[in-house]
């Protein structure tokens, strides 16, 4: 099986894939809290506990991290505990197969690149990829599979934290309120989070369609992923598909591309 590791600021998503290519399937997956102080040894222990059984079942590892301290420990862990299997960490210089048509390709986060690859292989192009993570990103993928750039906005959770810290409002459960107009503070905050971010994304996608002719037609797929996607997607008028494990699938594809390159 292939182990995939997606480290973000808020959480770490892990998945085990069986098979390859079009026959690959996600057998098991987990999400754990991100600790920026996590050491390589601690991360290895967590993985062993989650995977269970013989570690020999893992024949390869593909990973990314948008958290620099964890990225360093991730590299150390792979070298220390998984050196016997092929592994790929998505960072500048790693072959992804996605041309980055932007001013500075090194600025583009590995998560955005991997999502673009997965979306293009799954749905073709053109596509718009929305990731509801710590940040909310809206990225464009051309019909040729090129990354054309995108939009970065605050994430749902981080916006809520800002309200708590700066406005003195209390922490509330993120859930769909009864109405867009809240009758109390809790529902008002929930409305801003759920309907506000649905409107944000819908507005951005409408503007993208207006500005770029290649994204104005019915052949464009708008796909969403990310930890807050289940909350926002049902309220969106523009999102076509929800792929909860898009990033893990993208890591699988990057791994396969790099393995093919080693064999040629």
From Swiss-Prot:
Protein localization: Cytoplasm
Molecular function per GO: ATP binding; metal ion binding; pantothenate kinase activity
Cofactor stoichiometry and binding remark: A monovalent cation. Ammonium or potassium.
Keyword Cytoplasm found: yes
Top-rank taxon: Bacteria
Cofactor or coenzyme needed: NH4(+); K(+)
Residues bound to ATP: 6-13, 134
Catalytic reaction equation(s): (R)-pantothenate + ATP = (R)-4'-phosphopantothenate + ADP + H(+)
EC numbers for this chain: 2.7.1.33
The keyword Isomerase is annotated on this UniProt entry: no
A single cellular component GO annotation: cytoplasm
Gene3D superfamilies for the chain: 3.30.420.40
GO BP of this protein: coenzyme A biosynthetic process
Keywords linked to the UniProt accession: ATP-binding, Coenzyme A biosynthesis, Cytoplasm, Kinase, Metal-binding, Nucleotide-binding, Potassium, Transferase
Enzyme category, top tier: transferase
Family per record: Belongs to the type III pantothenate kinase family.
Subunit structure: Homodimer.
UniProt-recorded name of the protein: Type III pantothenate kinase
Source organism per UniProt: Nocardia farcinica (strain IFM 10152)
């Amino acid at each position: 099986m292939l182990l995939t590791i997606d480290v973000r600021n808020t959480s770490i998503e892990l998945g085990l894939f069986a098979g390859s290519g079009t026959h690959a399937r996600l057998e098991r997956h987990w999400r754990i809290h991100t600790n920026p102080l996590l050491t390589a040894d601690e991360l290895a222990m967590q993985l062993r506990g989650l995977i269970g059984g013989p570690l020999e079942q893992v024949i390869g590892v593909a990973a990314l991290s948008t958290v620099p301290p964890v990225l360093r420990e991730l590299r150390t862990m792979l070298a220390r505990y998984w050196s016997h299997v092929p592994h790929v960490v998505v960072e500048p210089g790693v072959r992804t197969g996605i041309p980055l048509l932007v001013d500075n390709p090194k600025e583009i986060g590995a998560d955005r690149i991997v999502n673009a690859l997965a979306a293009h292989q799954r749905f073709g192009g053109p596509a718009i990829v929305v990731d509801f993570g710590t940040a909310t990103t809206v990225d464009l993928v051309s019909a040729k599979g090129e990354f054309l750039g995108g939009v970065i906005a605050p994430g749902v959770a981080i916006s809520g934290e800002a309200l708590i810290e700066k406005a003195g409002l209390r922490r509330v459960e993120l859930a769909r309120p009864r109405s867009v107009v809240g009758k109390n503070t809790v529902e008002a905050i929930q409305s801003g989070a759920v309907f506000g971010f649905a409107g944000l994304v819908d507005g951005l996608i409408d503007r993208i369609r207006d500005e770029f002719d290649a994204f104005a037609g019915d052949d464009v797929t708008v796909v969403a992923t990310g930890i807050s996607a289940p909350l926002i997607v049902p309220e969106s008028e523009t999102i076509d598909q929800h792929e909860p494990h898009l990033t893990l699938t993208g890591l699988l594809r990057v791994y396969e591309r790099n393995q093919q390159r080693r064999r040629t």
